[in-house]
Amino acid sequence: MIWTPDLDSLSKIFSGLVENPSLASFPRRIILSPCRRDSMKDTAELFASLDALKARLDAHCPLSPDVVSQIREDMRIRFTYHSNAIEGNTLTMSETKAVLADGITIGGKSLREHLEAVGHSHAIDYLEALVQRDEALTERTLKEIHNLILRNIDGANAGTYRRMNVLISGAGHIPPPAERVPERMDAFFQWYGAARDRMHPVEFAARVHAGFVNILHPFKDGNGRTARLIMNFELMRAGFPTVIVPVDARPDYYRNLDIAATQGDYLPFVMQIAELAQKSFAPYWALLGE
């Protein structure tokens, strides 16, 4: 049985307060088990480690223009490559760099794959501008992020909520019907405004991602890329480096997202993102000689 929550329950799901009734007492048993208590302790230690890493990086601020430029270029290429590769884009890392940095057309690769790389890069530019202006995520900015990803690929659906029902291939849950998407998005933004200051920034960013792509899936296409972008938007606003989900982590990534959607258990996904966030400081240490 697939559980579709009402709007009141939806808001509680995002804060991790509702158990999936189709799974009886399964979530409660996990929460009260010694293993779960150990996992929560591990999460707290991860967050403390991330805060220490951020403080260490903040001590070097302001970073030199050369360091900032190199970090931005490296992040743009790696983030675009991995995020698109997760969705099936076959451009390699070096080909992605050639497209973005040099404007080169890669033989044997489709026009769509080139446009996906360029669109994702433009979306990163937009996120950086939002952060500079200290803007929060809104329905308008969310739709513009999606528009930048798809406007040269599927203009009719870019930046527009889906008008059709969809399935997520291989997932154990079904996104809401198209007619419910606008009200579900209203509930999402209500939760977003209320929850942001009640969680560690990395946990909040991970939950924004999981809730958006799993419970909502509001667009016909491009939901995964949009989710990874808005997750990183929240990390950037909080002063953390960009978290890149590597394509070789895709099986765990999808499995943890599905656990969050079907069991209401966000911990595995939050842990995965927190561990990747630890690794995201490495390019800074390399350039700073630490």
What are these regions (language model features)?
Residues 3-290:
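FIC/Doc superfamily catalytic core
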